[in-house]
C-alpha cells in the first residue's frame, strides 16, 4: 500500500522494515535489563502509548521520514511491552509459568495471524487513513494495562517487604560458564526455529502457487491454516513443559518437526498443506518453553532474558525473510524450501542443555522424594 501510494523503492521499503526491526528487537534486552533493576509498574501502558502515537502518525504520514518515525515508535512500544509482560505473566502464573507464558504469547501469534486478514479487509479497501482506526484498540489496551499496572505495583510492594533471603534464587547450581553455554544453545535453537518459520510465513504461499498452481486466495487460506496450527502449538507447549519438563518440550518441538519439514517440499499439494499444519503445531510449542527455561537459568533477570529472546525472535524473523528472499531471487522458491527444511535438525543440540527441574515436574519429584524419606523414617 505504501509503496504504491508514495512510489517508494524496494530500498526504501527495506529501510522502513529495518527501522522497525532495529527498534523492536535490538532495544528489548536493554529495556529488560533496566526493568530488572528499576521495575516500572506502568511501563506496559507507556509502551502501548508509543504504539498508539505511532499508529496515528502512520495513518496520516505524508512521506518517507514521518513513516520512519511512526514505525520506530511502534517498534519502541514493542520493545517496552514484551520484557515486562513476560515478568507480569510469570508473577501471575501461580507457579505454572509455562502455561502463563503460552497464554501471553498466543495473543501475539493470534494478532500476527490476523494482521494480513485485517490488512486485506480494512487497510487495502479504505486506504492509509484506516490505520488510525486501530488506535481504538490501542486505547482500550492502555486502559487494561493501567489496571494491570495497579496490580503489578501492589505485587512489587509485597516483594519489597520480603526478607533478603526470599529474593529470587536459581533452582540449580550451574556455574556461569554452563549458564552461558545453555543460553548460547537456546539462541541457536531460536535461530533454527525462526529462520524456518520466516521461510514458511513469507514464501509458503508462493511455493504452493508455483508448484501446484493454487490460487492466491487458496494459498492464503493454506498459510492461515499453518499460522492457526502455530497458535495451537504455542498454547500446548507451555503447560506441557510444566508437566514433563521444558528441555523435553524444546527437544521434541524443534527436532520433532524435522521429519515433516523434510517431507514437505516433496509432497503433493494436499500432503504439503497437511505437513505444514503438523510442522506449525509441533515447532511452535518450543518458544514459551525456551523463554521459561532461560528465565529459570537466571531468575533475577526475567526482563533481560525475555527481552533477549523476544528480540532474537523479531530480529531473526526479519533477517530470515531478507535472506530467503535474496536466495529465492537467485535460485527458486522450491530450492529455498529444501534448504530451510534442514534447519529443524539443529534441534539435536538440545541434548547438550543441562537438566533443570522446575515447575510441576520438579515439584512432583520433590514431593515424591519427601514422601519416600518420610516413609523410611517411620
Kindly give the residue locations of the regions a language model identified.
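Residue-level signature of mid-helix packing/kink "hotspots" within the transmembrane helices
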Residues: 21-29, 112-113, 227-235, 317-318
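Conserved MFS/SLC helix-loop-helix module at the cytosolic interface between two early adjacent transmembrane helices
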Residues: 26-64
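Helix-to-loop junctions at the C-terminal end of transmembrane segments
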Residues: 27-39, 234-245, 328-329
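Structural signature of the two symmetry-related core transmembrane helices
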Residues: 42-57, 248-262, 341
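Cytoplasmic helix-loop-helix junction between adjacent transmembrane helices
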Residues: 70-107
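Helix-loop-helix hairpin linking two adjacent transmembrane segments in secondary transporters
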Residues: 104-154
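Extracytoplasmic gate region of multi-pass secondary transporters
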Residues: 180-231
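C-terminal transmembrane helical hairpin of 12-TM major facilitator-type secondary transporters
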Residues: 241-290
